[in-house]
Structure formats: structure tokens, C-alpha cells
């Protein structure tokens, strides 16, 4: 890679974070907001994407062409994109190294069906499993996840809120620790309507994410 375009908030995967920290890449951030993601502070430019929400296709194409020209990039031949699509389709299907992996992928695949519930992903290991296991190029379900310093807090309550806001069913998949942190949200008052909410709990040895972080190099494995 020589040039990276960053959209959204790509800080979940350690491998992507490492890529964004490379000094030999020309990084451009495209943003629709006043705050943007620049993980390592190496972005050379920040380009506002201020087009209207429902922009005509020809106007959007023209704006995109101007953006490419301003970055000094040349339009790639269609065969270039096709070669990458073929390469992605030829990748071996990621293997499930544990039963927790298998559950997460099964839930993801079931949620790709037409009319499937909105999918709510628990923080920590659950969302990272699917970041690793979800196949590129496949139809993705509508998925929602909490992010933040206390991402596992309120996961079930978030599912109830999604149901109330959307009026449609919600399917939540989370680890055991995330479930325990918010099990009280399964309670409801005698006059409250029962939410159309599925809660799938993966027994993944709560707090297992810490064994994948820097702490694991200084602490005995049994502590995790």
C-alpha cells in the first residue's frame, strides 16, 4: 500500500491500527464531522465530506472525481478493483478456533437472512470475533455496537432501547461478563411491555480480552 483513505472510526482491529501507524504511507482522512480519527497522528491531510445526504449520483461522482484529483491520484482501471474482489473471494474461510467463535459466526450468518432482527454486538471479544470472522463481500446484517471506555455496560438496556426506537425485533449476542454487567435490564415493571429481544450469551471466560492486550505480557496466564 502507498496511500490510505480513512473513513469512519477504524480503531477496533489491532492490525488496522498498526497499519495506520506506519510512517511510509500517505494517509488521508475523509470526515463528515468536526472530529475525526487519526490513530497515530500521521494523517497528512483531512478532507471534509460535506455533500448533502441525498446527493444525485452524477453530482456525487463529480465531487468524488474532484476529491481524487485534489489528492493527486489517478483513476484506477476497473480491472484493478476486479482483481481485489477476486482475491477477497478466494481467501479461505476464517477458521473457528473455539466454540465461542462458532457461536458468533452462526449468529452473524443467521442475521443475514431477509427480515432478520437488528443485530446488537457485545463489546470486547464478541465484536472482535466478528471483525475477524465475517466474510468480506457478503451481505452484512444491520448491526449496532456500543463503543467507549465502559463498552460492556448497559448492553441489554441498549437492546431494549433499539427495540423501542425501531419497533422491530432485536437480537443481542454478548459475552458472559457483558451479560452479568447488565442482567438487571431483563427486569421490567408490571405495566411495561415485554421487549422483542433475543439475548444470546457466549461463555467465553469473562474478561478474556485482557489476555490479548499488553497486560498479558506481565501477568501470569492464570490471572485471566
Pin down the residues of each PLM region.
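Short, intrinsically disordered, charge-balanced linker/junction segments flanking boundaries
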Residues: 1-4, 108, 219-224
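Short glycine-rich anion-binding loops that position phosphate/pyrophosphate groups of nucleotides
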Residues: 9-12, 33-35, 124-126, 177, ...
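Active-site diphosphate/adenylate-binding microenvironment
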Residues: 79-167
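Short beta-strand segments
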Residues: 6-8, 30-31, 120-122, 173-174, ...
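Short helix/loop capping segments that flank catalytic or ligand/cofactor-binding pockets
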Residues: 13-16, 37-40, 129-131, 153, ...
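Structural motif
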Residues: 3, 118, 169-171
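Glycine-rich, acidic loop regions that bind phosphate or pyrophosphate groups
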Residues: 1-85, 189, 214
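Thiamine diphosphate
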Residues: 134-224
